[in-house]
Amino acid sequence: VNIPEFKVRVFKEDEPIHETRVIVGKTHTQTPIFTDEMEEIVFRPNWYVPNSIKQNEIAPYLRRGGGFFSSGWDTSVLRRQGLRIRGANGRDIDPDRIDWSRNDIRRYELYQPPGPRNVLGLVKFRFPNTHDVYLHDTTQKNLFSNPVRAFSHGCVRVQNPDKLATVLLGHDQDWSAARVSSAMHNGADANKVFIKNRIPVYLTYFTAVADENGELKQYKDLYGHDRRMIAALNGRPIPAGLPDNVTASSGGGERRVSRRSRRGDNPFAGIFDF
């Protein structure tokens, strides 16, 4: 994956055999740069909500209104998005039976079972890592038409996940496109297919790349990594975490738009773009 290019490529013996568009993390929820090995492909996966999203995006909304069993807790939004809550005993819990003003949401497992609303779509590609980042399908196919595709919480969404799965499992286990399609659309839920020969995965950040014809292609410094590196080499370091178009000065000029004004009145709209 080359983050600034919004592309993923598969190489076999140093030759590219497949490429497709991807969506990467926003400037404030960046896709990390690291290397790991793909261990499994999961068809019709569950989505387990990360603690960061539980605590920062879901909990504040659930706690509105105060008292126990208060109608101010609009837990119906969980049901509309197909989210379920599971306790320590492994059983699902009615969210209306929880005092959200007293209980830490991180104590509970929030998950979205397989289905048409699942934010991971029909397949995910796992390479277990400390960042909890992976490649996956998405229900928001329309976003792939954007030239700048930084919309996720850090994971990488793949435009043609069926073709990617066919390339990888075809090489590893002789799977056909028809078998992949069947697993995605008609197969068992949470069906894990383990990779026999682990596949190296590189999440990279190259803003200048030579194409197959030797022509130089340049891409925007999406996360400002190049800018910070140049500044550090010139003896004027810039704080980490600033995107490419934001300076370290306090002069302002950057226009900030609240999530509510950008996404309407649905406070959960920002969650389901994982």
Please annotate each region the language model reported.
Residues 1-274:
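Well-ordered beta-sheet/strand-loop patches within structured domains
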